Every structure is written in structure tokens, then in C-alpha cells.
Amino acid sequence: MKKWITGMLAIFMGVVSLSIPFAGLHTAEAGIKDTSDKKLKIVTTIFPEYDWTRAVLGEREADVELTMLLDNGTDLHSFQPAVKDIMKVSGCDLLIYVGGESDEWIEDALKSAQNKDMKTINLMEVLADSIKEEETVEGMQENEHGHEHEDEKEYDEHVWTSLHNASTVCDAIAETLTEMDPENKDIYQSNAEAYQKKLSALDAEYQDTVETATQNTLLFADRFPFRYLTDDYGLNYYAAFSGCSAESEASFKTITFLARKVDELGLNSVFTIEKSDDRIAQTVIENTKTKDQNILVLNSMQSITAQEITDGTTYLSVMEENLKVLKEALN
């Protein structure tokens, strides 16, 4: 992966080098500067960042060029940037990205960025005090593919599944936009505060749901990218794989453990994440005593597409739907 990224960056630098001699000629022939250059160019990597930025921008969204890189359903962990993606990052005014292991390519791209005045918001840095290490809970299958540096700590990248974290990042977005566009400071601050009130109200609903629930454990026959969500509300969990795992085939031992936990805890549901094929969940249920559990889907927002956004999907709408699913599972 690292060699592939290095190769892509080399291609990108070659494209940039070839284009520079012709830039002045193009401008002279046109007689005017491209009007798109007058807009702030904001690039986000994933959907939550994109939607939070839209919320903070409010009516100012029409005056910026806002881009979401992963807009075709590609998962953050499997995304491989094309030259056009690296060029978008290199030429933007503000880049908002997660900053975890999956974003190593961005750190490399930033070193070769065309815009030396670019501002960045690294979610892992903004949320430094709240970042959690990946954990392996009882029954969770180890990642057989391993990592390049086994002695390094691995941190959970899925920070956006926490409403608390969302609020903190919105502050950072509003602050950065204010630095870049001070004339509209009041708009950004007001929009951020209004959005944070919605986050807070939804957070209260989550808290009430958990406090009045008859169950407090979730079981995932899948990857588990919801550590930040469950920790916010004191929920317990079991899962086949960690959130960043590359595994997709559960062992007999893992299946057996999860099925026994379903029986032991009297769970009425087994969870998967969006776009799962349900095979592991079905196998777990087939190995329980009653074999009548529901398969429920919790949306981690790792694969939201541009079409879904056009159809009205928002961060809040996904988290509201997730709350409905949790209510069903916990009662």
C-alpha cells in the first residue's frame, strides 16, 4: 500500500510539473482568472465531516466549493486515492480528514501540496483527549493480517460515531472557517451552536433510551466500529472483529462464542453494519437455542454515497435511525 501511494504521488508531481509552464499562458489567453478560484475550496474525506461542514456553513455553502472524496460507497479502510483525489487535496484551502491509519496517504500528499497556506482539521488531533485504542474484547477474533509495526499502538478511527465528538469537531470547523473568512464569523458561530443543540437533544434521547432499557449489551456478528458510541452511554458489546479489522471470515470458535453469548444474555437481536452480507449473523443465529433472533443493522456511515446525500441523508438522520434500531435491540 505504501509503495502504491508513493507511486501515485510521483505521478501527481509529474503532472503538476508539466502543467506549471502552461499555467501563465492559459491565464493570459483567457484574459480573466477562473471564477472558481474565488471560492474557498474545502475537501472532506468522509460523509460525517462533509455534513458537519455543511451545517456550519449554512447559507454560506453556496459560496464555497465543498467536496467529499469518498462519495461512491467506498469504505475508508479500503479507499485507494486516484491522482484526481491527490490533486484535490493538494489544491484545496481547507482539508478535513480523520487522521488515522487509513489516512496515511493524506499525510504524504500534504508534504507535496501546492497550496502552502492550506489549513487542515485532523479529527484525531482535535479529539486527542477522547481517542481510544483499539481493544480486543472476549471472543473477538484476532486480525490475522496484522500490521506493519506490531509494537505500535492502534487507535480506533471511528470517532464520528460519538455525538459528543461531533459537537467538538463542529467547534473546530467553525473556528477554522472564522480564521479563513472573518467577515462571516457570526454566521459560522451561530450555525455551529444551532447544530450543537440538535446534537445535544439527540444525545439526551440516546441517554434516556439506555437508562430505561432492559438490556445493556450489543452483539455484532461483524466488524465493530461503534466503540465511541457504546462508551458514551455505558453499553457493553461483543463482536466478531474489531472496527478496523480486515477479516471477513469468522472462525468456528468465534461463531460458537457469539451464539452462546446470545443465549446466555437472552438477546433478541444480532447486529451487522451497513452493506454486510449477513452470512456471519445468520450462522450465529442458527447456532443459538431459539434460532429466532432478528438481524439489525447499525449504520456506521463509512459508505454513504453522493446519491444518498442527494436523497436527503444527513448525519443526524442516520444517528436518529440508529437510535430507533437500538431501542428495538435493548428492549
Predicted regions and their residues:
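Extracytoplasmic metal-acquisition and chelation regions
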Residues: 4-7, 14-331
